Amino acid sequence: MKYDVLARAGFARRGNLHLPHSIVETPVFMPVGTQGTMKGVVTEQLVAMDCRILLCNTYHLGHRPGHERVKAAGGIHKMMNWNRSILTDSGGFQMVSLSKLMTVDENGVNFESPHTGEMMALPPEKSIEIQQALGADIMMQLDHVIHVLTTGDIVKEAMHRSIRWLDRCKVAHTRDDQAMFPILQGGLNLDLRKECAEEMAKRAKVGIAIGGLSGGEEKDHFWRVVAACCAALPPHLPRYVMGVGFPVDLVICSFLGADMFDCVYPTRTARFGTAMVRRGGLMQLNQKRYKEDFLPIDDKCKCNTCKNYTRAYIHSIAGKETVACHLVSIHNIKHQLDLMRDVRQAIQSNSVEKFLRQFLFDYYGPIQSENPSKQDTEKVQEVPQWVRDAVDHMGYTLDF
């Protein structure tokens, strides 16, 4: 794996990540196919959107269908008919999401399967064994993940344990064709984050992840941790902020210096009939206001949904037919990929401030209406203070 920085603008970088299955342009959003499948989307559709990399979940694939079966099928790429890049997480996040089903000690994590009730031991070495069998382009170390709002000695303990587990993962990592990222921990404590960044940087060869965020912390804490971590990490390695998927978060983190992101948000929110749009942020298509709205979700979007279907049609089937989830998922994933394309272009052309002003004005403004005169009278929402503070930290100003 090789990472080339092609352009810089402020803290932000535009780069190319050279992986065995594709060249990934950064900053990049990675859709999540938890068990080797995207909710409501097939791989051919992802290729049509020019998605270059996606994420699969080691814990869930290890349980079902099992990493031995995936390996027997020729690896995760062949099994899911995907010839582009894949990143697998380590299973560490399930320490939070499945906290009632697990225990953790120095040896590793012990999970109870939510599917069968069977116990599964996951030491760092086993996490790497599973990920090597899956065959992803990028693997993650097993880290000790705690809830982001946790306080006390456990925060420091989990951070140091993550460093020790990284050393064990490095010994277990034997495949040269798979990159492995350390994961930076430390909660909301900036001093611990910087200490962890220093230790992880000594051990990192190809990239570093920033973990333990997007778990309900205040946004003011969120962006400051991302900014501090990016500033403390080596400039030649890609920085991956795990679990980030809200459009504003993607934009802000990219311009703070982060390069990679993942989240289930585009497909999860689609299940509730919620579409992501540049003008107005979120569109709740199950609301009655869209009953006779014959515009596409976004008239500037080139996804198959926006080319062929109206808001009124999706409203009529939202919550009733699975195809509604499929159509909105297609749009939401394309929205995120296009947003990151525009972020890269802003960095390349050194027009970040101009992009920020337009993006935030549109995002916190009104949703596009069939009645332009009514839309013109609506006022933009207040941009959150945390966003303004982050933009100010970058050295840019908003003119509204």
Curated annotation (Swiss-Prot):
Instruction: Give the keywords, sorted.
Output: Cytoplasm, Glycosyltransferase, Metal-binding, Transferase, tRNA processing, Zinc
Q: Where is this region: RNA binding?
A: 243-249, 267-271
| Keyword Zinc in annotation | yes
Tell me which residues this entry annotates as catalytic: D89 (proton acceptor), D262 (nucleophile)
**Molecular-function annotations in GO:** metal ion binding; tRNA-guanosine(34) queuine transglycosylase activity
Q: According to its UniProt record, where is this protein located?
A: Cytoplasm
Q: Which GO terms describe its cellular component?
A: cytoplasm
* Required cofactor names: Zn(2+)
Main localization is: cytoplasm
Please list the residues that bind Zn(2+).
C301, C303, C306, H331
Q: Which domain of life is it from?
A: Eukaryota
Residues that bind substrate: D89, S90, G91, G92, F93, D143, Q185, G212
* GO biological process annotation, one example: tRNA-guanine transglycosylation
The record's listing under Pfam families reads:
TGT
- Subunit architecture: Heterodimer of a catalytic subunit and an accessory subunit.
What does the protein in this record do? Catalytic subunit of the queuine tRNA-ribosyltransferase (TGT) that catalyzes the base-exchange of a guanine (G) residue with queuine (Q) at position 34 (anticodon wobble position) in tRNAs with GU(N) anticodons (tRNA-Asp, -Asn, -His and -Tyr), resulting in the hypermodified nucleoside queuosine (7-(((4,5-cis-dihydroxy-2-cyclopenten-1-yl)amino)methyl)-7-deazaguanosine). Catalysis occurs through a double-displacement mechanism. The nucleophile active site attacks the C1' of nucleotide 34 to detach the guanine base from the RNA, forming a covalent enzyme-RNA intermediate.
- Give the family this protein belongs to, as stated in its UniProt record: Belongs to the queuine tRNA-ribosyltransferase family.
Question: What's the name of the protein?
Answer: Queuine tRNA-ribosyltransferase catalytic subunit
**Natural source organism:** Caenorhabditis briggsae
